[in-house]
């Protein structure tokens, strides 16, 4: 049995750890509320961008912009969104596991794909396993602005525009609720022309200046940038929710451990007192 001093030391250290995890839980809760607000505020902008794409691409059935035109896939691109920090449960690990599983299933050689990474956790994971990273960005703010991730989005888009890759897939953790997030992947490029033209066929009567292709060459890259940014906002909400849950579980576990240690301390203390009383009684009997 551990000594009273050892048990007391463990109780004190666990209480300190509980204070830290409780504070981190509260901080993550605050960050989650802001992330949810950011995502909600960004949605109307994405809706308007969708309308703009629909108005132009949907006005003609023969739009031939490279971002809307599928081509033979000889090299795939993967944009993976992870966290910079740990203490977020399996947030990054689940996304990276899904990425690696898909890469191993689809490709025989590293020349068949390129990886762009957001987040230190993803960079470390992939480098430690020998994967080449074409571009990475770390130290992303907890509430990222569009400008803070624009370089990453532009690089991923340039890989497709310059035909270094023939498709761009994004891997991230989709925020469902505080208690649920889902490792998700979806194709970003080429854009689905069917999706970009659905629901607004009556806009074909519009006239465009200078012409549809010139307009698309401007708004399509902006639209893809917005898709990537919106996905990052979604992933950040998932990260904060996962970390908040992890810190709550850690706090609850610390509380349970403190209770168990306190019970062990009281039992050890009682045994020590009983032994002292027994020794005193035994000593008194010996003197009689």
Curated annotation (Swiss-Prot):
CDD domains: F1-ATPase_gamma. Keywords: ATP synthesis, Cell membrane, CF(1), Hydrogen ion transport, Ion transport, Membrane, Transport. It comes from the Bacteria. Produces ATP from ADP in the presence of a proton gradient across the membrane. The gamma chain is believed to be important in regulating ATPase activity and the flow of protons through the CF(0) complex. The keyword Transcription regulation does not apply. The keyword Transport applies. It is a peripheral membrane protein. InterPro entries: ATP_synth_F1_ATPase_gsu (IPR035968), ATP_synth_F1_gsu (IPR000131). It is found in: Cell membrane. One of its GO terms (cellular component) is plasma membrane. Its main location: membrane. Belongs to the ATPase gamma chain family. F-type ATPases have 2 components, CF(1) - the catalytic core - and CF(0) - the membrane proton channel. CF(1) has five subunits: alpha(3), beta(3), gamma(1), delta(1), epsilon(1). CF(0) has three main subunits: a, b and c. This is ATP synthase gamma chain. Transmembrane segments: none annotated. GO terms for molecular function: ATP binding; proton-transporting ATP synthase activity, rotational mechanism. GO terms for biological process: proton motive force-driven plasma membrane ATP synthesis.
